[in-house]
Amino acid sequence: MSIKFEITKQNNIHFEIAAVAAALVGYFTSASWWVILLFAAVYFGLVNVKLELPVKLSWLWAAILLVIGAILSVFSVQYVLLTDEDFVKTTDMVCVVNVVLALAIYLVILFITNNTRLTCTIASIAILAFGFIDYFVYEFRGNEFTYADLKSAGTGLSVVTKYKFVIDYKFLYVILAAVLYIMLVRRIEVQFESAIHMRIISILLTIICVLYVIMNSMSLNTETWEKKGTYRNGYLLNFVLGIRDSFVKAPDGYSKAAVDKIAGNFKETDSSYSQSDAKNPTIIVIMNESFADLSVVGDFETNTQVTPFMDSLSENTLKGYALSSVYGAKTPNSEWEFETGNSMAFLPDGSVVYQQYINDDPTSIVSNLKNIGYTTVAMHPYYATGWSRNKVYPHLGYDETYFIDDFDQTKILREYITDQELYDKIIDRYEKKSDDEKLYIMGVTMQNHGGYGERYDNFNQEVYKVGASYTDANQYLSLLNESDKALENLITYFKGVDDPVEIVFFGDHQPGLCNDFIKLLNGKGNSGLTEQELENLYKVPFFIWTNYETDAQKVDVTSLNYLSTLTLERANIDLPAYNRFLAELMEKIPAINSRGYYSKKNECFMHVEDATGDEAKWIKAYNILQYNSMFDEKDRSSLLFPYLK
């Protein structure tokens, strides 16, 4: 090994340029001056030193440089993307997996270039740039850059110039660190005796790294809400998990012929939308955030009835419980199941359809009603970018969309716009409709969103559990009581109108409450549950009410994917072909979600893969049709899944 230290005019020029650039950037980003001075000192030392290492130990020096680069790359990306609070949430194991993943990237580039300097330079810049892209994408739309975004990169680039982005001192720090790392690499001479041996070792180590990442990420889910993916999985790994979950395998027995065979049983002999007896009611759908009846988990007593009005509904009402596919979070999956009739049962755990699988115009109750002349409206009193609704709603076929800026933001309970404000907006839109306008409105509330641990001056807690006190549960129950009052106002208004109106109401999922409270209800909490006990955590109440005469019915259990079919049936609108399939499926498989299905034959909840006989055949047919609708663009059934007209 030889170390040479030589101060030259050219090196001094390089140093001066780097120091001035760092100082200027530091001035505009309010970075600490001691960081700038430290950078200048280290850079001065590196720019004037040259290390020549023994050829026989080249593999060792290369390994050290690559490992340092991988660690620095992962640390830099996490540091830029996360707040200090979120940064420390990432576990050591997750950090190790991300470093190994980054090392695999370095090794692949080394295999291609056979040059350690070039490899470290390219890999470190590429990974850091990748992190910067995610930072700007998050600032632009409120969620992270994922593999699915590559399909719509052109759209993003077309509007990105219209936005102003602000960078802070973190950018400078990681850039300075990257510059020092690259300078270190450039000052070290690493030569390999055999390029072939180096490439063989590189590919073998890459395989080992990839296998390690796979083995340690099999139980992890892609996270797509805000920056959960970065602090729970690490950004690099979360991006790779998104790639994994973007490719859904075709079910066994899938083919165009299999789809056509199933579809053949639901061919239309006349117009699918013959409405000679239809009332063409105004259809209002309310998906209420975290609205649940916790008594399905276990009995408990409160000081007053939580939802007295909803409990009293019976006349002209179909009501009961439906299985959601999510618990405590990931609202859009419930929204999607209702709208399309499809199920999370056949998609990867943790996936979010709105952000991963909607790239064209899926058939839904929205598109079906739009095709028969309905004006379709979506309302959500929160940010348009939440769960990518601003991109998804046009695909679904909504004519009008209303988000947080369209509501009175003084009507707040805790931190969110109230149910009553949303319902007032729905009533206002109804009153503005023309006499011959057929109207469909989907309202997604925000009032009851978790968490429930903070105290608020604008919220009076009126409902509480008798006995042991649980702060979050009491706040949640009080919120439900407020929702019930707003619901009563909505129903009362539409009882008084002459036009036919149908109101569909359901919760998206149960709330995420403390495990001690859940344990009080079911004796176990959230773990060690039987299939029946587990499904109880996924039950949400629903009803379909009309202001005209319909049969009063109770449903013990169904699932959200069937509610749009029930909505059309209660409106006396002829069912499209896919909904007719779902209506028959509902007779065989009364409820199905991401956790399993209800077996009529065995009178219990079971895992989908444990289905046998006729139940297995119907579930398989459902899986085949759903795959056709979501992933087979070339041979998608035009009978079952027509595009918007």
Feature-to-residue mapping (PLM):
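Generic structural signal of hydrophobic/aromatic residues within well-ordered alpha-helices
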Residues: 42, 76-77, 156, 239, ...
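Residues that form generic nucleotide/phosphate-binding pockets
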Residues: 132, 159, 187, 242, ...
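Membrane-interface segments at or immediately adjacent to transmembrane helices
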Residues: 215-285
